[in-house]
Amino acid sequence: MLDLKFIRENPDAVREAIRVKNVALDLDDLLQRDRDLVALKQRVEAMQTERNANAKLVPKASPEDRPGLIQKGKDLSEDLKALEPQLREQEDALKQLLLRVPNIPLPGVPVGKDEDDNVELRREGELPGFDFTPLDQVEILEKQGWADFERVARVSGSRSYLLKGDAALLEMAVLMFALDFLSQRGFTPLSTTALVRRETLVNSGHFPGDEESVYKLEGDELLLAGTAEVPINSLYAGEQLSADELPLTFAGFSAAFRREAGSAGRDVRGLIRVHEFRKVEQYVLCRADQEEGLKWFERLLSNAEGLLQALELPYRVIQNCTGDMGAGKVLMYDIETWVPSEQKYRETHSCSYLGDWQARRTGLRYRDEHGKLLYAHTLNNTGIASPRILVPLLENHQQADGTVRVPAALRPYLGGREVLGQPVR
């Protein structure tokens, strides 16, 4: 959410953000509704002033004038009461439009329509040079008996998965490694819920706009979040912190759920795109200072790259264009990790800086050293999302006999084992 005063004073900048982010919003309609609401509030305030002035006249009025003044007060009160529903309706309508206003991208963000217009910044790590025909993720899992996609589909339908044996241990290992890695870098580990209220998804910016991707529990006013960012973002909703309490840095672990409503037919096979997964999410609350925010952005990015380097996985860093960065973000980078069977990089991490856009929605402010109340800035980035990360892990580290080499960083979490599986080819 942007400051309404900023929108009034900078309509061209907001209109351009709406255009380059492909947001369906009529800014002229919003501004007209704002003017109408201001006029209605002024009318209400004038009537309240008149009613208060009239009330002061009643005790001093003559017996002849008093009944008329009393009646006038009643009439004004009734008129004000009649305006209350109209005032609430106009306030709610304006708020719903304000929730759709996108943030202003930082200078230098490439303008584009979708992911095809994203810009590659760099590549890291060497691509594997196999001297054998490599298997894909599903072939590795099935040959080792590490997954049962057929049976779990009877339980949960498509886009579900069941890991067994070493693959299940590998998933736990990589998640624990990510939590330890981030904890050692000063991030507080959180084990948080995926069950959230609707306003929590509004606070994070997923609503309005992403309703089709979210599971809702029938009979309850609860939904299933797709990332720990959602509940963490609302932990301090409505609170006032002091400047010395910031920054707050978290490594949030949670189950995550996504309906993948817009992904029909894409990545149905295997572990890339599933409805339920586990995720470690980096989340930062910092002061309302863009320079500080950008430093945290680089740190979150460095953490994600450090995790992938420790896992010995080749990857590339992408700068997202305006049309592929989401409404609330001023800057966004994706990290894509190499998947040998597809001969391409696949997204595994998204690093985002949102300025005060989320904090305005949650009402989270802090008092600076001068006593001024400011909205905090928020950032987030994936730590590890599983089982997706298992795809490049299994494929890049497979060996000629069908076993999988364990990266050194994960061996302490797997009893010191250097290889998973049995020779199957």
UniProtKB/Swiss-Prot annotation:
Location in the cell reads: Cytoplasm
The main place the protein resides is cytoplasm
One cellular component (GO) term of this entry: cytoplasm
Catalytic reaction(s) noted: tRNA(Ser) + L-serine + ATP = L-seryl-tRNA(Ser) + AMP + diphosphate + H(+); tRNA(Sec) + L-serine + ATP = L-seryl-tRNA(Sec) + AMP + diphosphate + H(+)
Keyword presence, Acetylation: no
A biological process (GO) of this protein is: seryl-tRNA aminoacylation
Cited InterPro entries: aa-tRNA-synt_IIb (IPR002314), aa-tRNA-synth_II (IPR006195), aa-tRNA-synth_II/BPL/LPL (IPR045864), Ser-tRNA-ligase_type_1 (IPR002317), Ser-tRNA-synth_1_N (IPR015866), SerRS_1_N_sf (IPR042103), SerRS_core (IPR033729), tRNA-bd_arm (IPR010978)
Tell me the superkingdom of the source.
Answer: Bacteria
The record's top EC class is ligase
Sample GO molecular function, one term = ATP binding
Q: Which biological pathway?
A: Aminoacyl-tRNA biosynthesis; selenocysteinyl-tRNA(Sec) biosynthesis; L-seryl-tRNA(Sec) from L-serine and tRNA(Sec): step 1/1
Annotated binding of L-serine, by residue: T227, A228, E229, E281, T382
By sequence similarity, the record places it as follows: Belongs to the class-II aminoacyl-tRNA synthetase family. Type-1 seryl-tRNA synthetase subfamily.
Subunit record text:
Homodimer. The tRNA molecule binds across the dimer.
Function statement: Catalyzes the attachment of serine to tRNA(Ser). Is also able to aminoacylate tRNA(Sec) with serine, to form the misacylated tRNA L-seryl-tRNA(Sec), which will be further converted into selenocysteinyl-tRNA(Sec).
Q: What is this protein called?
A: Serine--tRNA ligase
Provenance organism = Deinococcus radiodurans (strain ATCC 13939 / DSM 20539 / JCM 16871 / CCUG 27074 / LMG 4051 / NBRC 15346 / NCIMB 9279 / VKM B-1422 / R1)
Q: Gene encoding this chain?
A: serS
